[in-house]
C-alpha cells in the first residue's frame, strides 16, 4: 500500500506547465481518451485531468476525474517516471459512460500508457 498516495506535488497546476505540455507534448490517442505527455526534470510524475463541459453534467465530469486520479494513484508503477501527463476524456466516452465501469476505463488508460513505454 505504500506509495499509493496522490500528493500535492504530483498535481500539474501552473499555467506555464500546462502550456509546456500542450506545446511540446506527445499524444496517445484512442476512442475514449487523449493523453498528452512531456518529460519533466523531476523524479516523479505530475498529472492533470481536463474534462470539457460538453462531457456531461458536473456529477459525471467529477466522477470521471476521480476515476482517472484513482487509476493513476493505484497504478503508479505502470507509469514511467519523470513525465507530466494531461488526461482528456473524449466525447465518445460521455455517450457510453453509463455503460462503462471503472475496470474498463482502467484497462483503456493502462493500455495507452504501455504504448508510451514501447
Curated annotation (Swiss-Prot):
Keyword DNA repair in record: no
GO annotation, cellular component aspect: ribonuclease P complex
Top EC class, one word: hydrolase
Domain of life: Bacteria
Record's catalysed reaction(s): Endonucleolytic cleavage of RNA, removing 5'-extranucleotides from tRNA precursor
InterPro entries: Ribosomal_Su5_D2-typ_SF, Ribsml_uS5_D2-typ_fold_subgr, RNase_P, RNase_P_CS
Keywords from the UniProt entry: Endonuclease, Hydrolase, Nuclease, RNA-binding, tRNA processing
Enzyme Commission designation: 3.1.26.5
Example GO biological process: tRNA 5'-leader removal
GO MF annotation: an example: tRNA binding
Function in brief: RNaseP catalyzes the removal of the 5'-leader sequence from pre-tRNA to produce the mature 5'-terminus. It can also cleave other RNA substrates such as 4.5S RNA. The protein component plays an auxiliary but essential role in vivo by binding to the 5'-leader sequence and broadening the substrate specificity of the ribozyme.
Assembly and interaction partners: Consists of a catalytic RNA component (M1 or rnpB) and a protein subunit.
Similarity comment text for this entry: Belongs to the RnpA family.
Protein name, as recorded: Ribonuclease P protein component
UniProt organism field: Petrotoga mobilis (strain DSM 10674 / SJ95)
